UniProtKB/Swiss-Prot annotation:
It is found in: Membrane. On ligand binding, forms a receptor complex consisting of two type II and two type I transmembrane serine/threonine kinases. Type II receptors phosphorylate and activate type I receptors which autophosphorylate, then bind and activate SMAD transcriptional regulators. Receptor for anti-Muellerian hormone. It comes from Mus musculus. ATP binds at residues 205-213, 226. Belongs to the protein kinase superfamily. TKL Ser/Thr protein kinase family. TGFB receptor subfamily. It catalyses: L-threonyl-[receptor-protein] + ATP = O-phospho-L-threonyl-[receptor-protein] + ADP + H(+); L-seryl-[receptor-protein] + ATP = O-phospho-L-seryl-[receptor-protein] + ADP + H(+). This is Anti-Muellerian hormone type-2 receptor. The gene is Amhr2. It comes from the Eukaryota. InterPro entries: Anti-muellerian_hrmn_rcpt_II, Kinase-like_dom_sf, Prot_kinase_dom, Ser-Thr/Tyr_kinase_cat_dom, Snake_toxin-like_sf, TGFB_receptor. One of its GO terms (biological process) is transforming growth factor beta receptor signaling pathway. Interacts with type I receptor ACVR1. The chain crosses the membrane at residues 148-168. SUPFAM superfamilies: Protein kinase-like (PK-like), Snake toxin-like.
Length: 568
């Protein structure tokens, strides 16, 4: 029976470990997906296989065992990414979990002492399987009492420290006149936002979990007003901090006008973001209502890539520093359509400032608080595989988040191209569908997305006519496939996607968008066009890829106005 696993030999090393850092047994069975090595620093106890790991983000160890036909085998041991219920346990007390194999049962445990995950105290019976005999952990007499007193003392010290820090922070805020703390710093200083007396609310155009978006007027200009309730002040501060970064102005990023406080009529006053209003609505709304020709589709795709490349770029310009920014919530609801039918990226509530090489020390971003903060993301449908299975590279998290954005960008490019009439022999695209809607429906669960995108490595379907409608039979397919590759390191950068789309939009240095791609041969499946696609970059190392969507009306005239939308 697998009990102690021969790993208690690691315990003497605990005396050499910092008392502020939990040390756990580390083990991963061959073939296990999703390594937890990045959650701590490896500690070798000797030349043999047993290893320890010193936790970086929690004080909690875990263990996973697989019980099959009465035989237990260890699957994983290591550090958890955060302290959670169960971590206060002194010993590893396994809890049964479901297993895809009916003849097997997984047991997991969490505990909060050094090397507590080296063995389990017992495995409770599951179904008709026999459980191993109880094994009492070898504990020093009086150990639990001593540990309880130690934990109580640590709790009192932390409580006193928190009270002192809160008082000092409150005093500092008063001295500074209510200055706003850094986003995510945990500060709760009250601040006096300006009252926007000239702001007029007209109608609600979108409601979300953290805010309500209104159409309104400010000093005679039509604007979008993102109104946050008092409980969502942290979300307000985080989004405002990104919009107020110097050098963030760009045609394809939603324009920030001002921030303040106020409210419509009798409703309580709260923090507000005032943004430019985009009457044509979101990309999702637009694609649902209209089809587009080749030139309009390229305009939307290229402007979207330009906006994301700008967000990701770290640069100095005119004496102003702009850090790299990961969006983390790209979706067709969070992209808005401008009057010229180009795109503007909005909803920066989850955006994260990235560490940079040229960053002034005063502008260095606050390190996210552990993996949970880094892995936080927006709309599940557009989440990259490494976010769905939580294998994102936490050592180089800035680059990893940019690669996850490019995956989301690929799904948006697929949605745009799915409504391009020139990519269909009959010029009649099907009704608009979101990415993966054809495979999983309109409201897929995280488990369904994981099974399709991670386990099966499926992506939205790319119709064969897309290859035939362009003179390069591989151009669009390559672009999309290189953006949503299962290997994050193999994906294009946003700048590279921009270059590839620019070559499609301006073939041979043309000054305007092409009206349509070269026509499709009669038999698209057997006779793809063989000519060299003039839109394909001839000297770029970048690659590209795309997929399918819905339909109804033909392209709208530029002056046509549809229901007002704004990102939230």
């Amino acid at each position: 029976m697998l009990g102690t696993l021969g790993l208690w030999t690691l315990l003497p090393a605990a005396a050499q470990v910092s008392p502020n850092r939990r040390t756990c047994v580390f083990f991963e069975a061959p073939g296990v997906r999703g390594s937890t090595k990045t959650l701590g620093e490896m500690v070798d106890a000797g030349p043999g296989p047993p290893k320890g790991i010193r936790c970086l983000y929690s004080h909690c160890c875990f263990g996973i065992w697989n019980l099959t036909h009465g035989r237990a085998q260890v699957e994983m041991q290591g550090c958890r990414d955060s302290d959670e219920p169960g971590c206060e346990s002194l010993h590893c007390d396994p809890v049964p979990r479901a297993h895809p194999n009916p003849s097997s049962t997984l047991f997991t445990c969490s505990c909060g002492t050094d090397f507590c995950n080296a063995n389990y105290s017992h495995l409770p019976p599951s179904g008709n399987q026999g459980a191993p005999g109880p094994q009492e952990p070898q504990a020093t007499p009086g150990g639990p009492v001593w540990m309880a007193l130690l934990l109580l003392g640590m709790f009192l010290v932390l409580l006193l420290s928190s009270i002192i820090l809160a008082l000092l922070q409150r005093k500092a805020c008063r001295v500074q006149g209510g200055s706003d703390p850094e986003p995510g710093s945990g500060g709760d200083c009250s601040e006096e936002l300006p009252e926007l007396a000239e702001l007029r609310f007209s109608q609600v155009i979108q409601e979300g979990g953290h805010a309500v978006v209104w159409a309104g007027r400010l000093q005679g200009e039509m604007v979008a007003i993102k109104a946050f309730p008092p409980r969502a002040v942290a979300q307000f501060r985080a989004e405002r901090a990104v919009y107020q970064l110097l050098g963030l102005q760009h045609d394809h990023i939603v324009r920030f006008i001002t921030a303040g406080q106020g409210g419509p009529g009798p409703l309580p006053s709260g923090p507000l973001l005032v943004l430019e209003l985009y009457p044509k609505g979101s990309l999702c709304h637009y694609l649902t209502q209209y089809t587009s020709d080749w030139g309009s589709s390229l305009r939307m795709a290229l402007s979207l890539a330009e906006g994301l490349a700008f967000l990701h770029e770290e640069r100095w310009q005119d004496g102003q520093y702009k850090p790299g920014i990961a969006h983390r919530d790209l979706s067709s609801q969070n992209v808005l359509i401008r009057e010229d039918r180009s795109c503007a990226i909005g909803d920066l509530g989850l955006a994260l400032v990235l560490p940079g090489l040229a960053q002034p020390p005063a502008l260095a971003p606050t390190q996210p608080r552990g993996p949970a903060a880094i892995l936080e993301a927006g709309t599940q449908r557009y989440m990259a595989p490494e976010l769905l299975d939580k294998t994102l590279d936490l050592q180089d998290w800035g680059t990893a988040l940019q690669r996850a954005d490019v995956y989301s960008l690929a799904l948006l490019l697929w949605e745009i191209l799915s409504r391009c009439s020139d990519l269909r022999p009959d010029h009649r695209p099907p009704p608009f569908q979101l990415a993966y809607e054809a495979e999983l429906g309109s409201n897929p669960s995280a488990c369904e997305l994981w099974a399709l995108a991670v386990e099966e490595r499926k992506r939205p379907n790319i119709p064969s006519t897309w290859s035939c409608s362009a003179t390069d039979p591989r151009g669009l397919r390559e672009l999309l496939e290189d953006c949503w590759d299962a290997d994050p390191e193999a994906r294009l950068t946003a700048e590279c996607v921009q270059q590839r789309l620019a070559a499609l939009a301006y073939p041979h240095g043309a000054s305007s968008f092409p009206e349509s791609p070269q026509g499709c041969p009669e038999n698209c499946l057997s006779a793809p066009a063989s000519a060299v696609f003039p839109c394909r970059p001839q000297q770029s190392s970048c690659l590209l890829s795309v997929q399918q969507g819905p339909g109804s009306r033909s392209p709208d005239p530029v002056g046509d106005t549809v229901q007002v939308y704004v990102n939230e």
